[in-house]
Design a protein with these regions (language model features):
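Glycine-rich phosphate/pyrophosphate-handling loop used in enzymes and phosphotransfer proteins
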Residues: 1-207, 211-242
Length: 242
């Protein structure tokens, strides 16, 4: 009886006592308060449908590819991004990645699910969603994979199977953020292996931030070589320029 009362009290407290907005710090019942939601999310930027690079124009206009994707299409087929990697949204990615603010993974995942409902209309249905894998050493050090923290709620909302072990990181590479852009592709070129059958599948790949695109490029190439029919990237934030 006492245990049940404790559970009820905990649920009541969670519902009744406000948290703080992850951006402004004001009291809020949601991870992002309504004010910050309106100010920083729901952007209308037109993006390249292949790599999510921002383009001139507004969302809803004709779907043009950026010059790089038009000239040399990457191995992935589409990329969805919530917003640019810029202040103050960049702090959310950093808090998730380095400060174990795992509620932000759910926030990113659920927002990506809403975006996907419209953006992927008419595309082949997703068969499985998987995170960009971390090297074992880094996973042990951090204790979690921030991409998986996004992938699980995304898959749950889209009612798609999630698989944390679909791909494996077989090379413990240097952090991409420490390398010049031209060195990033070589750094991750042979970093991944496919651990489950993917032949004929539409695979959704999840990461927190897309910068040069080298990591997602390498993983998509590995998936395609293993027979994946289509690869769609889901990223919380996208740097404005490669």
């Amino acid at each position: 009886m006492a245990a049940r009362a404790g559970i009820v009290l905990a649920r009541f407290s969670a519902a009744a006592l406000p948290n703080r907005c992850a951006l402004c710090g004001n009291l809020s019942h949601r991870t992002i308060c309504d004010c910050c939601d309106g100010a920083y999310w729901n952007e209308a930027r037109l993006r390249c449908p292949r790599c999510a690079l921002p383009l001139p124009g507004a969302r809803g206009a004709m779907r043009f590819h950026c010059g790089a994707c038009a000239k040399t299409p990457p191995p992935f087929d589409a990329t969805l991004a919530l917003a640019d990697y810029r202040a103050p949204l960049d702090s959310l990615a950093l808090d998730l990645k380095f400060r174990a603010q795992l509620a932000l993974g759910r926030e990113f995942g659920e927002r990506l699910a809403r975006l996907a409902t419209d953006a992927l209309d008419g595309a082949p249905p997703l068969d499985v969603i998987a995170p960009v894998p971390l090297a074992r050493r880094r996973l042990v050090e951090r204790g979690y994979n921030q991409a998986w923290a996004i992938a699980r709620p995304l898959a749950r909302k889209l009612k798609v199977r999630a698989d944390a072990a679909l791909a494996a990181r077989v090379a413990d590479t240097a952090p991409q953020s420490r390398l010049a852009f031209d060195a990033r592709r070589a750094n991750v070129a042979a970093a991944f292996a496919v651990a489950r059958p993917v032949a004929g599948l539409h695979v959704g790949v999840v990461d927190d931030v897309m910068t040069s695109g080298a990591t997602l490029d390498a993983l998509a190439r590995t998936l395609k070589e293993a027979g994946a029919r289509r690869v769609t990237n889901f990223v919380a934030l996208r740097t404005a320029k490669d």
